Amino acid sequence: MYEEFPDVITFQSYVEQSNGEGGKTYKWVDEFTAAAHVQPISQEEYYKAQQLQTPIGYNIYTPYDDRIDKKMRVIYRGKIVTFIGDPVDLSGLQEITRIKGKEDGAYVG
């Protein structure tokens, strides 16, 4: 499995928390860590994305996990990667999920 998914990513969700004074705050929290293969997009995909004005930077492949939600984001090597569109079950057999993502320019840690 290591050869197929050599990278490690952390999925985060944006959650509401009480601030202790009757108000609410929102913050990103770690949900779970997963093995993955993070691949920069090809020149062809980059060109198509530019034409459609859809900034994509990575294809992320990870074992299927029903906890993955399009409202999440991924931390990869300290970089924040936001989802572009919905995660896709590639085979329809709940084996591998593909996530298209883009860096938002921020770093964690």
Swiss-Prot record:
Signal peptide: none annotated. One of its GO terms (biological process) is symbiont genome ejection through host cell envelope, long flexible tail mechanism. Keywords: Viral genome ejection through host cell envelope, Viral long flexible tail ejection system, Viral penetration into host cytoplasm, Virion, Virus entry into host cell. Pfam families: Phage_H_T_join. The keyword Calcium does not apply. The keyword Endoplasmic reticulum does not apply. It is found in: Virion. GO terms for cellular component: virion component. InterPro entries: Phage_SPP1_head-tail_adaptor, SSP1_head-tail_sf. Homododecamer. Interacts with the connector protein gp15. Interacts with the head-tail joining protein gp17. Belongs to the Caudoviricetes gp7/gp16 head completion protein family. NCBIfam families: gp16_SPP1. Functions as a stopper that is part of the head-tail connector and that locks the viral DNA in the capsid. Following tail attachment to the entry receptor, seems to open by a diaphragm-like motion, allowing the genome to exit the capsid through the tail tube to the host cell. During assembly, functions as a docking platform which the preassembled tail tapered by the head-tail joining protein gp17 can bind to. This is Head completion protein gp16. It comes from Bacillus phage SPP1.
